[in-house]
């Protein structure tokens, strides 16, 4: 099993400039899911995707002329593995001096390698120079929790802060906070994010929810793992009928990671970059 501490994170790395798929370092999802009460071999109570965006992708055409593009990768949450982010960066950089016939050929190669590493089917989209000006930005929709004037003293995940008034009629609500911060599982480097929680069910106590989200501030876990922990804690403590959790994290090493988890059928998020990304 690939363990996070064996990944390139926190270690000096030689940057290869010619294509090398072996740089990708997959990490199994299951151990962290076991931690949040999801045993191996049983269905998980959510589905979704991890949306990655790469802003530093370059290669050479067959004449040796550099090419650049943005790339997005949609990794289903039911793949057995995630990709450790530094290894992803090193892999993408390995294309820098690699001659490739066309953007389409690169897209096919990325699809193959990432699908192999994750154990599923990864969608790949390239945005070449001609379309860069068409890229749009947008913020997460929803009622801003950060408006609340609260006192905070918990900085490790505290699901007991969550509650919902089960005596009230169900509501449909979308809540947003830009105060999510966690830390890399291996290096402890800060990860900054915005999070959107959509639900149908008993009204969730908003002050408690904001305190809970802030409680991740000193917590060490990868982005995907944090979002699944949030999903499970809200489900257990607040018991919504429907729940979707979406986080957009700021980029590091030219990559941002945006996990989405839901228990009801809905369109995947539209992947608009927000102002902090």
Swiss-Prot record:
InterPro entries: GTP-CH-I_C/QueF (IPR043133), NADPH_dep_7-cyano-7-deazaG_red (IPR050084), QueF (IPR029500), QueF_N (IPR029139), QueF_type2 (IPR016428). The active site is at residues 184, 191. It catalyses: 7-aminomethyl-7-carbaguanine + 2 NADP(+) = 7-cyano-7-deazaguanine + 2 NADPH + 3 H(+). It comes from the Bacteria. Keywords: Cytoplasm, NADP, Oxidoreductase, Queuosine biosynthesis. The keyword Transmembrane does not apply. One of its GO terms (cellular component) is cytoplasm. One of its GO terms (molecular function) is preQ1 synthase activity. NADPH binds at residues 85-86, 252-253. The keyword DNA repair does not apply. GO terms for biological process: queuosine biosynthetic process; tRNA modification. It is found in: Cytoplasm. Substrate binds at residues 83-85, 223-224. Pathway: tRNA modification; tRNA-queuosine biosynthesis. Its main location: cytoplasm. Its EC number is 1.7.1.13. Catalyzes the NADPH-dependent reduction of 7-cyano-7-deazaguanine (preQ0) to 7-aminomethyl-7-deazaguanine (preQ1). Belongs to the GTP cyclohydrolase I family. QueF type 2 subfamily. Homodimer. This is NADPH-dependent 7-cyano-7-deazaguanine reductase. It comes from Cupriavidus necator (strain ATCC 17699 / DSM 428 / KCTC 22496 / NCIMB 10442 / H16 / Stanier 337) (Ralstonia eutropha). The lineage of its organism: Bacteria, Pseudomonadati, Pseudomonadota, Betaproteobacteria, Burkholderiales.
